Amino acid sequence: MASTFRLQIVTPSRTFYDDEVEMAIVRSTEGDLGIMSNHMLMVAPLKIGKVRIKKDGQFREAAISEGFVQVESEYTRIITDTAEWPEEIDVQRAEEAKERAEKRLSASQGEIDRLRAEIALKRALNRLSVANGK
């Protein structure tokens, strides 16, 4: 059996995940990070994306928003605004959010409006990707 470490995924509203895992893969601002037991200590900012969790030889994905990953000797903690399993994602709501963001992007007047619309679109596309298993 592969060596494991404790993975915690925490949002402002709940502890989304807390268990022993073999590996976690997250998207940092510098690219994908594969974290395993005895990984070097670090803190890194995360982009909107998926977290892939390997437990008992099987991978499971969840959608996460921006945040941070903290790798310590005893655990790894992901702190993010939101985290959702595929079955928790309301696909219709995500589709509507995507459409709203696309409309806001095409009609945006200022830089801040455009940036907000881009972030909203990334979140919606990420949620849809995880919900659809892509």
UniProtKB/Swiss-Prot annotation:
Bilayer topology: Peripheral membrane protein
GO cellular component: plasma membrane; proton-transporting ATP synthase complex
InterPro entries tied to this protein: ATP_F1_dsu/esu_C_sf, ATP_synth_F1_dsu/esu, ATP_synth_F1_dsu/esu_N, ATP_synth_F1_esu_C, ATPsynth_dsu/esu_N
Keyword Transmembrane helix: no
Molecular function in Gene Ontology: ATP binding; proton-transporting ATP synthase activity, rotational mechanism
Main subcellular localisation: membrane
Top-rank taxon, per record: Bacteria
Alphabetic keyword roster: ATP synthesis, Cell membrane, CF(1), Hydrogen ion transport, Ion transport, Membrane, Transport
Gene3D superfamilies, per the entry: ATP synthase delta/epsilon subunit, C-terminal domain (1.20.5.440), F0F1 ATP synthase delta/epsilon subunit, N-terminal (2.60.15.10)
Subcellular location: Cell membrane
Family of the protein in this entry: Belongs to the ATPase epsilon chain family.
Function: Produces ATP from ADP in the presence of a proton gradient across the membrane.
Protein name as it appears in the record: ATP synthase epsilon chain
Provenance organism: Alkaliphilus oremlandii (strain OhILAs) (Clostridium oremlandii (strain OhILAs))
Lineage, opening ranks: Bacteria, Bacillati, Bacillota, Clostridia, Peptostreptococcales
